[in-house]
């Protein structure tokens, strides 16, 4: 799950780099960076919501919800959140570097 999120962010960054360098890409592969970031954030939110709801179902004693599944989903949620935080940190760092460049 986290690998797919990283791949989509990497694809968006590569597309932005190609557009900045003046290279042309075909319209099917180029995507708006903001849209890709929004999709990644929505995926993180969905993962957290699913993990929370499964944990609540386990706490209420619903049938078919095992502790193993709950723990795995909570860890997936945690890893995806950490990935999102690291991507944000890299974006802030890159923005800071660009703003500190002399023209």
UniProtKB/Swiss-Prot annotation:
Cysteine pairings via disulfide bonds: none
- Work out whether the entry's keyword set contains Membrane: no
Compartments (UniProt record)? Bacterial flagellum basal body
The organism's superkingdom is given as Bacteria
> Where is it found, in Gene Ontology cellular component terms?
bacterial-type flagellum basal body
The entry's keywords? Bacterial flagellum
Where is this chain primarily localised? other
Molecular function terms, GO-annotated:
cytoskeletal motor activity; structural molecule activity
Any one GO biological process: bacterial-type flagellum-dependent cell motility
| Pfam (any one) | FliE
Which InterPro entries is this protein grouped with? Answer: FliE
Cited NCBIfam families: fliE
- Family indicated by similarity: Belongs to the FliE family.
Designated name of the protein: Flagellar hook-basal body complex protein FliE
Annotated source species: Erwinia tasmaniensis (strain DSM 17950 / CFBP 7177 / CIP 109463 / NCPPB 4357 / Et1/99)
Encoding gene, per UniProt annotation: fliE
């Amino acid at each position: 799950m986290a690998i797919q999120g990283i791949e989509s962010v990497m694809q968006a960054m590569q597309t932005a780099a190609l557009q900045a360098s003046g290279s042309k890409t075909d319209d099917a592969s180029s995507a708006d960076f903001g849209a890709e970031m929004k999709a990644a954030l929505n995926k993180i939110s969905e993962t957290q919501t699913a993990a929370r709801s499964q944990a609540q179902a386990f706490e209420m004693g619903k049938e078919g919800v095992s502790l193993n599944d709950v723990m795995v989903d909570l860890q997936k949620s945690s890893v995806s959140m950490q990935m999102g935080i690291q991507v944000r940190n890299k974006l802030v760092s890159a923005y800071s570097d660009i703003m500190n460049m002399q023209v």
